[in-house]
Amino acid sequence: MTNKVIQRNIHISHRKASLVIDLVRNKPVHEAIRILSNTPKKFAPIVLKLLNSAISNVQHNSKDMDPSKLYIYKIVANQGPTMKRTLPRAKGSADQLFKRTTHLEIVLSDDVNEREKELAAIKAKKSKKPLAVEPIAKVETKKVAKPSKVEIKPVEKDENVDPELLKREQQVLKVVEKTASQKEEETTETIMISTSPKNAQVLFDDLEKNVIFYKTTPINKVLRVLVYVTSPTKKVVGEFDLESVEIGAISSIWRKYSKQSVISKKEYDAYYEGKDKAHALVSKKAYKYRNPKDLSEYNMTKGPSGFQYLK
């Protein structure tokens, strides 16, 4: 059996303490007392006092141990906390002092084979195998089939389709290279404008929203307006017959057409920021193409920045 005593925070360096404890390690207690009593070191009386305390503890409290067979089984001096202080020097400077401490530990034993027993216990602990953990059976999960893409079937001939829509879809229009003048008012009556996908959807799907706003409008008389949708669609998605074009102050145009507008008041104000006039294009009837058309069908490579005459 063993008996352990500890004294903490002894005001001495653990390196100086090690010089003393190395003299008595694994020695019988009576021999250790003789060595410490004749060692002229500051730490020797401290070790001797703690050793006598350990012997007294065995004699009075450990009935299972034989005091006559005691020896120092383990003795260590571990480093404790270090206190930092300063020493004043010349010219206002200071040197730093380190006041080190030591923790002294002494373990006594009466069994000569104590070391072998301790090593055997460690080996036995390491040799114990951990309990086998049964592997968790994998749960097979069925893969959910992805929904197949819905194919848009072409419109059959017998479906109820507006003949006017069919006529407009089949009509071939090309870009007018030169800008229309007042003399071409009777012959030039179709234009193409650009708008966002959101505005186009509102224009063609909501019958009550039939007014689209622009910053400029053509001089010539226009009866038909094709609608080109910007990114990501980038196609002509439909057209509408133009009922009228009204130009006026920004506030008055909004008061008149706010309920019919395809955009909100916030978008309207942002669109006409810094402008004096607003241009309202009022749709009489809108036609949404069943199959949107590419710009190449109109001999165009990019969408109109303002409006483009077609013929």
Swiss-Prot record:
Name the Gene Ontology biological process terms.
translation
Q: Which InterPro entries match?
A: Ribosomal_uL22, Ribosomal_uL22_bac/chlpt-type, Ribosomal_uL22_bac/org-type, Ribosomal_uL22_CS, Ribosomal_uL22_sf
> Care to name a GO molecular-function term for this sequence?
structural constituent of ribosome
Any single Pfam family the record assigns to this protein: Ribosomal_L22
GO CC entries: cytosolic large ribosomal subunit
Q: Which PROSITE patterns match?
A: RIBOSOMAL_L22
Where does the secretion signal sit in this chain? none
Q: Which residues form a coiled coil?
A: none
Instruction: Supply the alphabetized keyword list.
Output: Ribonucleoprotein, Ribosomal protein, RNA-binding, rRNA-binding
**Domain of life where this protein originates:** Bacteria
Known role = This protein binds specifically to 23S rRNA; its binding is stimulated by other ribosomal proteins, e.g. L4, L17, and L20. It is important during the early stages of 50S assembly. It makes multiple contacts with different domains of the 23S rRNA in the assembled 50S subunit and ribosome. The globular domain of the protein is located near the polypeptide exit tunnel on the outside of the subunit, while an extended beta-hairpin is found that lines the wall of the exit tunnel in the center of the 70S ribosome.
**Family to which the UniProt record says this protein belongs:** Belongs to the universal ribosomal protein uL22 family.
Subunit info?
Part of the 50S ribosomal subunit.
**UniProt name for this protein:** Large ribosomal subunit protein uL22
Please tell me the species this chain comes from: Ureaplasma parvum serovar 3 (strain ATCC 700970)
What would be the name of the gene that encodes this protein?
Answer: rplV
